Amino acid sequence: MNVVELLGLPALEEHLQRLEPLLVESVVTGDGFLDEVTTHLLAAGGKRLRPVLALATATSGSGAATREDLLGAVAVELVHLASLYHDDVMDEATVRRNVESVNARFGNLVAIVAGDFLLARSAEIAAGLGTEIAALLAATLGELCQGQVAEVHSAFQVGRSQDSYTDAIAGKTASLMATSCRIGALTGGLRRDEVDAFTLFGRYFGMVFQVRDDILDVVGTEAELGKPAGQDLAEGIYTLPVLLALADPDAGPELGPLLGQPLGQPERDKARSIVAESGAIGGATTVARHYAELAASAAVSGPSADLARAFTRLAHALVDDLPAD
């Protein structure tokens, strides 16, 4: 999915071209080894989704990105990158963005400290943008950690509730999407009601994004995902499709005995097959579509009709290609 093309906002491409050197500049120290570690995933690319949200929101009224707008986008992307460094250590992942993960290449200790370094740089940038943005980013880091801890705490719990799942993804994913939009709205000088509206869009968009990701973890391939498929199942992270399958009177009795323990590849494949063939995928898609509609409703409250249409397209694009059943 090419996010910039989908949004149909021509100036965004130029903004992102200006963003890339700032991202590199923000993490380069002059220490050759540390620079190699901190730029590893930057060099691998990525959708830059959170900076896109920040920049699209910031420029919704003027169309021109200021240095403050760009630095706000850098700050949220560094938080996202740091979370990937830490997540891959926790998951013992070996692949990220179709390249070696940082922990696989440099070791867990280096990956953890490098992730901390990225967070420190993000905080430093946010401090330069004012106390409101600095406090917002700090609060978001707390939400990210709370969501991640909630997910880890529920690992291998076959009786995990859907509310537990919703709370976890609201923290670990939706919070940073919301903050990306809010920081963009703040650096862009939008009215307070517009700031709040775009923040709400970002939160609902983040919920759609994570539910979609969890569906694709079941039905997607490693080539499509850029990481091994079924990784959450193997690690005991039971996401919405799995929880819905467990509640299904036909799939649940077959799936339940497989879970509650680490899964080898054969068991992982069998569990994915059970979930995919149940009605759980359609049920999860319905939830994703609900969040997409909420996101679209929030977007129309902004100052730009073009951006409202663009954000609505983006939210709908996340669900348009999901399987209905």
Positions of the model-derived regions?
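All-alpha prenyltransferase/terpene-synthase fold signal
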Residues: 1-325
